[in-house]
Amino acid sequence: MRILLSNDDGYLAPGLAALYEALKPIADVTVMAPEQNCSGASNSLTLSRPLSVLRSANGFYYVNGTPTDSVHIALTGMLDHRPDLVVSGINNGQNMGEDTLYSGTVAAATEGIMFGVPAIAFSLVDKDWVHLEDAVRVSAEIVAHYLEQPLPGHPLLNVNIPNLPYDQLGDWQITRLGKRHPSQPVIRQTNPRGEPIYWIGPAGSARDASEGTDFHAVANGHVSITPLQLDLTHTQMLPAARDWARAGSGAS
């Protein structure tokens, strides 16, 4: 089995190195990750300049671009063989609810799906890496289970792991995305020239953390696994939207 491993925290991130070591015994793993931390890069591709791919002393490949660039280059020109699975992470912090739209971690996995390769994104809730090895153990178990018993089609799974010791983690729960309150206001500061500068404010707290959501599962110590899809069509709105379009079209 072959795995393409990427992330959005950069090729030097502890989560990437730890997950690589855990996956080596179960698959042939190639690492292709961004050079720098690209948290919040979402699915951005670099189209305004050429990209360089280098190899570090530990054998990891890295690109001076985004997480999506990393996986795109690997799948369309660098790898000699098509991987059986794209894995992204482990991210330093959660990717739940609307976070998934901003997440470079999820985006790296999404790029695999764009080329028909199943993908799993892993995130460790909280940002202190205290229980990284525990999260790595769970991640490797999920990957091994998928390789032994694949889901139908080309799944995109978003996994969030509570920052807890392994023996305190609950079972794996299949969840839907919860919802957050809007982000907090930007933080305005002044640079040395007296000009205003802005920092993006912290993410909003959970608004829908009801049973069945990723927020609820993680808050109760469970590993959250959310199947995602690329089709953003609001299917329930289609009938009303068609009526609206016909009314407007006829009026003109």
Curated annotation (Swiss-Prot):
Q: How is the cofactor bound?
A: Binds 1 divalent metal cation per subunit.
Q: Which UniProt keywords apply?
A: Cytoplasm, Hydrolase, Metal-binding, Nucleotide-binding
Main location (coarse class): cytoplasm
- Main enzyme class: hydrolase
Q: Please verify whether the record's keywords include Metal-binding.
A: yes
Q: What is its EC number?
A: 3.1.3.5
Protein name, entry field: 5'-nucleotidase SurE
Its gene?
surE
